[in-house]
């Protein structure tokens, strides 16, 4: 029995029990790599959840984009409501890295916008890893970037116990040293205030207030308070307050780092002057000396991450410490959609280094700036204790690492079979497709169409719109939240046909889609390779009448392989259904509002997102309403403070609506 408590309204069925047992057995026999080869819709996430429960180790679940990470986090939180399921993605809403373009002599300064809410979730993840073992962190690939040293972060934490003697002024200095700011007027995340013998802190990793009552220098009580109502939520005997930033540099380490930076600067200036690069030398000297002054005076400077090697005391070329270093030695890695995620891990380092080299060569940065980087692929895998690759189409590298430890999961709990596949010629393909679409629309079903080019997708969208089809086009410029909303609208029948290029493959859960059409299926290449075709065909694998039409004049090797693999899986599924008397059932998966789903991860929404939630009040669960009322009250007070009385009145009315809904339920 482990600390993980899996809660699900169903038991493992089909080949899930065998898959769970095989994976657990492989992990317990200390095999480093294993693969779960699971067809679309077979419940791979549930299988992984069951494995985590049985193994009982802290787990990192790696997803290849933020949208998929959010989806996985929501699912795992439903499976493990009593355990810590954390969300760790890049905290930038906007990020323009520092760069230099020699051809036009253009220097682009780094500019970024940090999402405070996501920063809180990142801190919550690292705090959970220090305090408990029943932790699952769902992360994007950005987790392989440097994150500061876990040992220093833990060492800098301030431990407080009821009855402990702690000089108040010393405690305030300690809070400032770990990047907390004093603000006696407004108490928000990363701030504290002192009123008489009462110290209130909002830690970096949550939005509750920690209230510490002193009697002289003795800690009399420690309590968690609701930030809005002041209600006591929990009484504590002890607490650890972790730093407000992950990058923590002790004062003595900072002095050594500044000396090392100065030494490197002197050596680099000699190199540049010998090479006749006087402009570059002058530029580097001026910039670095200014940064050194800032570091010595305030312990911080813009672009401080470029000095991370010196600040951390690493040797040249040594890998930075990142999220995986916060895990204990026996941690488990799960790589979701591994055929996409693994190549992403490989590509992160090379892209970063090419940009840094230009900055270093032209005197914008010291050579040590190159060590502020993501992990190389081999460095990342060296840190991995044990790993499960999860994919319907695992890559060759994953299969090679797993050797014969490949666990197939082909049977769907619903009995739904893999789609039927039809190959049709390209001549008259659009008119043929139009007929298929009309047939599906009559049955209130949805259609996905994938094209090879953006231009073709646009033209096809226009053509279908002119013929009265409700169609949308999904392209790469659409942001993550908008993308989820478009998919949401497709599921709810706002439109019937979705067209895209490379956006219709992994991670789309669309039970309403009964037809996938692949245009130019015979054009060999990345988008029409075997794995891509299987993934795209799989988008119709959740519907009992799922079909895929491949339009092409030739049968390529990729098409043949994809068709044969789908037929093989379909035959296994049919045989299982006949043997057990299973009649395929449609997947009844309630479409959940994307903003409400985001609310499950991020308990704080901006004003625009709050408005979208309020427009869907009927969809809110009773558990979500109190949280939403608190957020609306905070927005109402903020609006009133800014003299925006119309907005404040609107929030007041929304709060009344929500309270009425709660009261009606009680009655």
From Swiss-Prot:
Gene of this entry: uvrB
Complex and partners: Forms a heterotetramer with UvrA during the search for lesions. Interacts with UvrC in an incision complex.
Alphabetized GO MF terms: ATP binding; ATP hydrolysis activity; DNA binding; excinuclease ABC activity; helicase activity
Comment, domains: The beta-hairpin motif is involved in DNA binding.
Stretches assigned to the Helicase C-terminal domain: 429-595
Keyword Phosphoprotein: no
Major location category of this protein: cytoplasm
PANTHER family per the UniProt record, alphabetical: UVRABC SYSTEM PROTEIN B
Name used for this protein in its record: UvrABC system protein B
Residue ranges of domain Helicase ATP-binding in the record: 25-180
PROSITE patterns in UniProt: HELICASE_ATP_BIND_1 (PS51192), HELICASE_CTER (PS51194), UVR (PS50151)
Main function: The UvrABC repair system catalyzes the recognition and processing of DNA lesions. A damage recognition complex composed of 2 UvrA and 2 UvrB subunits scans DNA for abnormalities. Upon binding of the UvrA(2)B(2) complex to a putative damaged site, the DNA wraps around one UvrB monomer. DNA wrap is dependent on ATP binding by UvrB and probably causes local melting of the DNA helix, facilitating insertion of UvrB beta-hairpin between the DNA strands. Then UvrB probes one DNA strand for the presence of a lesion.
Domain of life of the native organism: Bacteria
GO CC annotation terms, alphabetical: cytoplasm; excinuclease repair complex
Matching CDD domains: DEXHc_UvrB, SF2_C_UvrB
